[in-house]
Amino acid sequence: MSPLSPAEVQIEPKVRSSLQERGELEALRFKWIESEKAGYDLGEMAVRQWIGRYWQRFIRQKWLEHLYGETCWVEFDPRAFGILRRSHLLESPLTETILEHFRWGEENLHIIQWAMDAGQPMDEIRVILTTLDVNSSRVPCQFDPARPRYRTAAG
């Protein structure tokens, strides 16, 4: 990996967080809420349910936080941290539109199809998509629902 440029050093994060740790805590919170509703401990099944329902959305939201420079997630490329603040991408109105598509869970192909249908400038779309690189944000869930490290969802 190449060293950080001067622009990247200026927004070097003070705190780095782990998607796996935060995801596990979110899954345990979900388990607690669902267990309270059911009246008994749903256990590992509830954690697996959270992973199936929410992991991808959770990762997408955290990826956007990483791009905006809000939170540095160690599983994402450190060079992408704050890229929206230090690049000229936000000067293009298309960038926010594309980011909104990503917030909805869409992928590059959906965005390219939308851009073609809407007659958007494809060269600019390609530059934005290449810079954002949504494909690098694919992080599999690695914590084991059968063996949570945390015993409670609080804190």
Feature locations, PLM:
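Polar low-complexity intrinsically disordered regions
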Residues: S2-G155
